[in-house]
């Protein structure tokens, strides 16, 4: 069996899809379906069982057995970079992750988890080294602290432990994320409403490493299949502008004039204006597949969003 926490969420459900594509259906999805709309991410996927997150955590703490587990993909967390309830964030993203990590280490179960580029903060160098890490929000701090915890226990680990610092992920199955969904998702919705697509004023200076979720899932699967351990950046290695995203959306629809709106006050000083993954460490593992450009990935995503 394979366990995917956050399996009804954005990246988790794409990992489930990638596993299905390999012929694996013996999957336990763990999630919190209080937001009932997330069920839609699982409708076209094949899984063996579902478990509520709180019940799962209780079972993990109690040391309950789930049978033979080939891997755990831990994507379940609070992913809202705008959430400022530190107690809630640390419980969800740090304490929960530690419990699950030790459960896997004790049973030598390969453990793959979601970290984040938010661990870096305001830097021009995005390399998996302590000197470049300085998160700007409590979400980034929770991910940073767990990475530090993993770094300390990795030398003693007898089974793979692998963290992925996701950069700006976009693509299918993010509909439930609301304001935290990707720019491409929001621009598509604006055009469908008959509006012009809108970017924040000054965003011509913002460049992000936008990575397609299918590529993210592929790296997770490859690292599992190859027994990789460590903490790795997961982006394309190439920063592109928000304008490039908007241009790809407009080109797909064949309509829309890009407008600018004021930059939100609450995001100032808490916003990464530039991200670009240094992929040297990931490439050193032997992973050599290419990543989709914004033009390629957004076009594929638009086709998925607007399918009949």
Curated annotation (Swiss-Prot):
CDD domains: ADP_GME_SDR_e
InterPro entries (alphabetical): Epimerase_deHydtase, Heptose_epim, NAD(P)-bd_dom_sf
Annotated catalytic residues: 139, 177
Molecular function as annotated in GO: ADP-glyceromanno-heptose 6-epimerase activity; NADP binding
Keywords for the protein's UniProt record, in alphabetical order: Carbohydrate metabolism, Isomerase, NADP
Protein family membership: Belongs to the NAD(P)-dependent epimerase/dehydratase family. HldD subfamily.
UniProt-recorded name of the protein: ADP-L-glycero-D-manno-heptose-6-epimerase
């Amino acid at each position: 069996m394979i366990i995917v926490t956050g399996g009804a969420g954005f990246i988790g459900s794409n990992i489930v899809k990638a596993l299905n594509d390999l012929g694996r259906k013996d999957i336990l999805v763990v999630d919190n379906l209080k937001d009932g709309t997330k069920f839609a991410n699982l409708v076209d996927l094949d899984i063996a069982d579902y478990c509520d997150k709180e019940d799962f955590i209780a079972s993990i703490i109690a040391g309950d057995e789930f049978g033979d587990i080939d891997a755990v993909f831990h994507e379940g967390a609070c992913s809202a970079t705008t959430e400022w309830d530190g107690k809630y964030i640390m419980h969800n993203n740090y304490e929960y992750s530690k419990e699950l990590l030790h459960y896997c280490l004790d049973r030598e179960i390969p453990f793959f988890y979601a970290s984040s580029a938010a661990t870096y903060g305001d830097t021009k160098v995005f390399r998996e080294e302590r000197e470049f890490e300085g998160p700007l929000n409590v979400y980034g701090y929770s991910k940073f602290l767990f990475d530090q915890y993993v770094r300390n226990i990795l030398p003693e680990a007898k089974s793979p432990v692998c963290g992925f610092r996701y950069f700006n992920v976009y693509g299918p199955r993010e509909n439930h994320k609301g304001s935290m969904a990707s720019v491409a998702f929001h621009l598509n919705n604006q055009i469908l409403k008959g509006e012009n697509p809108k970017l924040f004023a000054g965003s011509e200076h913002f460049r992000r490493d936008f990575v397609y979720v299918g590529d993210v899932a592929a790296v997770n699967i490859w690292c599992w299949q190859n027994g990789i351990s460590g903490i790795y950046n997961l982006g394309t290695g190439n920063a592109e502008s928000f304008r490039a995203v908007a241009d790809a959306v407009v080109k797909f629809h064949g309509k829309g004039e890009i407008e600018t709106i004021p930059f939100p006050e609450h995001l100032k000083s808490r916003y990464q204006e530039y991200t670009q993954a240094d992929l040297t460490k990931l490439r050193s593992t032997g992973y050599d597949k290419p990543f989709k450009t914004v033009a390629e990935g957004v076009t594929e995503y638009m086709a998925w969003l607007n399918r009949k």
